[in-house]
């Protein structure tokens, strides 16, 4: 009767209560049980309170309970009915397998998307390259056109400058011929032959004076010796006065100074529309131009030229960065505007 009563009493107790009573009879604490079973104290507490943690699989929970029972010397057969209630076996949720055709369809769709993306990228790159090439080609054609125009203007100016000396020579020849206008002086030459001796004295003066003075020299040679001495200082006096009248022009405050580090095409126009320079300037060349401000400049290679206006450098960095033909205007206050 006593054994049957104790058996019925044990069945009435839950698994957790039986394990806790057995632990207390052995004088073990929850910390000691957790260290021996290599479990957390919270897990031992949940087992004794008949709790099944949601994050713990039932298979692991049943294994922990069996290890706990062996530790406190409780037969596993006595705990099996309680285990079925406390930690029932739960069927694992198996995710439905995706068909191979679905994955293949998705992969095919991703492949089309990547192909379209690469196609758009190539089109954008191609359009950008074509735009850059057209812009670069247009700049090169513009530079070539300006260079051809400047060469044509230089050739035209060269032909005009060559024709001018020929016209001057033809006009000056008749001016030198009126020398026979002194037939009256021949009688003086016959009467005073000694008057021809001062001629060597007047020869250096003939080299330094203009052709109209030659007539004065001829008349001086035909005069007597005494007047000849008085005319020599008169003919010599214009020389120092002409030299003193020649003065070097003062430096123009609006002068435009340019130094070239490479070959560069250039065109400079002043306020009156006069082209001060138009053509190709070579490396290590220098230009010093003066005119009426403001100046309009066209520079084919801005990186190859250094400009000083009113003693201050002109900033061309914005044209150098974009690598394009520089078009700017230099005002009297040195404010370059595109």
UniProtKB/Swiss-Prot annotation:
Pfam families: HTH_25 (PF13413), RodZ_C (PF13464). It comes from the Bacteria. Keywords: Cell inner membrane, Cell membrane, Cell shape, DNA-binding, Membrane, Signal-anchor, Transmembrane, Transmembrane helix. One of its GO terms (molecular function) is DNA binding. The chain crosses the membrane at residues 112-132. The helix-turn-helix (HTH) motif in the cytoplasmic domain of the N-terminus is involved in the formation of spirals to maintain the rigid rod shape. As this protein is anchored in the cytoplasmic membrane, the HTH motif may contribute to protein-protein interactions to form the RodZ helix, which is localized beneath the cytoplasmic membrane. The C-terminal domain may be critical for determination of the rod shape by probably interacting with enzymes required for synthesis of the peptidoglycan layer, including PBPs in the periplasm. The keyword Thylakoid does not apply. PROSITE patterns: HTH_CROC1 (PS50943). Belongs to the RodZ family. Residues 155-240 are annotated as: Disordered. Residues 133-338 are periplasmic. This is Cytoskeleton protein RodZ. Residues 155-169, 203-217 have a biased composition (Polar residues). Residues 19-71 form the HTH cro/C1-type domain. Residues 30-49 bind DNA. The gene is rodZ. Cytoskeletal protein that is involved in cell-shape control through regulation of the length of the long axis. GO terms for biological process: regulation of cell shape. The keyword Mitochondrion does not apply. InterPro entries: Bact_Cytoskel_RodZ (IPR050400), Cro/C1-type_HTH (IPR001387), Lambda_DNA-bd_dom_sf (IPR010982), RodZ (IPR023690), RodZ-like_C (IPR025194). Residues 170-188, 218-240 have a biased composition (Low complexity). Residues 1-111 are cytoplasmic. Disulfide bonds: none annotated. It is a single-pass type II membrane protein. GO terms for cellular component: plasma membrane. It is found in: Cell inner membrane.
């Amino acid at each position: 009767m006593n054994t049957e009563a104790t058996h019925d009493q044990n069945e009435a107790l839950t698994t957790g209560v039986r394990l806790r009573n057995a632990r207390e009879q052995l004088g073990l604490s929850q910390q000691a049980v957790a260290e021996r079973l290599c479990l957390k104290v919270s897990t031992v507490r949940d087992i004794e309170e008949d709790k099944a943690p949601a994050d713990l699989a039932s298979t692991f929970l049943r294994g922990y309970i069996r290890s706990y029972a062996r530790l406190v010397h409780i037969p596993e057969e006595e705990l099996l009915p309680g285990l079925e209630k406390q930690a029932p076996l739960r069927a694992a949720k198996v995710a439905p397998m995706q068909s191979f055709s679905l994955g293949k369809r998705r992969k095919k769709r991703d492949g089309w998307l990547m192909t379209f993306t690469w196609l758009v990228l190539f089109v954008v790159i191609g359009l950008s390259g074509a735009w850059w090439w057209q812009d670069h080609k247009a700049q090169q054609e513009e530079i070539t056109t300006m260079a051809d125009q400047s060469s044509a203007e230089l050739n035209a100016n060269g032909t005009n400058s060559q024709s001018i000396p020929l016209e001057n020579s033809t006009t000056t020849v008749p001016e030198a011929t009126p020398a026979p206008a002194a037939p009256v002086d021949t009688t003086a030459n016959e009467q005073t032959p000694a008057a021809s001796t001062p001629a060597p004295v007047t020869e250096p003066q003939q080299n330094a004076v203009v052709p109209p003075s030659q007539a004065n020299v001829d008349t001086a040679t035909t005069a007597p010796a005494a007047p000849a001495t008085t005319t020599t200082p008169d003919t010599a006096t214009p020389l120092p006065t002409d030299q003193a009248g020649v003065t070097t022009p003062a430096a123009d405050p609006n002068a435009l100074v340019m130094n070239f580090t490479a070959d560069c095409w250039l065109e400079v126009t002043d306020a009156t529309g006069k082209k001060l320079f138009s053509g190709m300037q070579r490396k290590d060349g220098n230009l010093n131009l003066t005119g009426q401000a403001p100046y309009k400049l066209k520079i084919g290679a801005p990186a190859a030229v250094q400009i000083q206006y009113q003693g201050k450098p002109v900033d061309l960095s914005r044209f150098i960065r974009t690598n394009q033909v520089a078009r700017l205007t230099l005002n009297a206050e040195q404010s370059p505007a595109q």
